[in-house]
A protein has these predicted regions:
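Alpha-helical transmembrane segments in multipass membrane proteins, preferentially the mid-helix core
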Residues: 56-61, 109-130, 141-142, 146-153
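C-terminal transmembrane-bundle signature of multipass membrane proteins
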Residues: 150-161, 175-205
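Juxtamembrane "helix-exit" motif on the non-cytosolic side of transmembrane helices
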Residues: 27-37, 85-93, 153-163
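Membrane-interface helix-boundary motifs at transmembrane edges
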Residues: 4-8, 61-71, 121-134
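Hydrophobic cores of alpha-helical transmembrane segments in multi-pass inner/ER membrane proteins
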Residues: 17-22, 49-62, 104-119, 178-194
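Membrane-interfacial loop-to-transmembrane alpha-helix junctions, especially the N-terminal start
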Residues: 9-18, 67-78, 135-140
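Short aromatic-rich membrane-water interface segments that cap or initiate transmembrane helices
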Residues: 37-48, 167-181
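Membrane-proximal helix-loop-helix units in multi-pass membrane proteins
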Residues: 77-132
Length: 211
């Protein structure tokens, strides 16, 4: 007889993804239909984007598993922390328009330096190679593709073509930021799945994953 498949966690992850999709729409809807924030720096959409990136970094940074911490976790957490710094550029604008670049570079230097250090280099390469063969990496790659689409889809010249003389910047911003929020939501779900599977100490963890 075949063993009954354990569907608890696949269903949990599917529910999480659906919930995040609904959350993304709800945040945009609150900004546009209820509070009329125009999706500026202080808005439900922007703040949710920042929280999602912070959670992604935290989930990779705190991924459990005795003796399995390697430069890979630092690298992944640093990637999301760098994106968070870029999203928080409004906090640095009073200093200068590009002040966000300095903490961005500092975080990147620490994360990359740790990952390629003599202590972690070999394990980082092995962990990264193994991680790239997991469904979680595919989900992160999908989120990255959606993020690229949001940038292209949000080009002002494109929306001028779509709306002509009726062009309104808010329409462009809503579409761009909404799709960007969805990309971060996909990343958050993937990060959550990674954390849970590491917590369960399943065989696909970065040192041993093969599928």
């Amino acid at each position: 007889m075949y063993a009954r498949p354990d569907l608890k966690y696949p269903l949990l992850f599917a529910l999480a993804k659906c919930s995040v999709a609904v959350l993304c729409f709800a945040m945009v809807w609150l900004d546009i239909a209820v509070f009329h924030t125009e999706i500026l720096e202080i808005s439900f959409t922007e703040i949710t984007q920042e929280l999602m990136l912070a959670l992604c970094a935290l989930l990779f940074w705190t991924a459990p598993g005795t003796g399995r911490k390697s430069g890979f976790e630092f690298l992944a957490a640093g990637f999301f922390a760098c994106l968070l710094t870029r999203e928080l550029d409004g906090l640095f604008d009073p200093i200068s328009h590009s002040a966000w670049l300095w903490p961005f570079l500092a975080i990147a230097a620490v994360a990359i330096g740790n990952a390629v250090s003599a202590k972690h280099r070999q394990r980082t390469v092995q962990a990264l190679g193994a991680f790239m063969r997991t469904p979680t990496f595919a989900a992160l790659a999908t989120g990255f593709a959606v993020l690229i689409f949001s940038r292209i889809f949000g080009m002002g010249s494109f929306w001028h073509q779509v709306m002509g003389d009726s062009y309104q910047r808010l329409a462009k911003t809503t579409a761009e930021e909404g799709v960007e929020l969805l990309a971060y939501g996909i990343w958050l779900c993937a990060s959550f799945e990674y954390w849970v599977k590491c917590r369960l100490a399943e065989s696909w963890s970065p040192q041993t994953a093969t599928s």
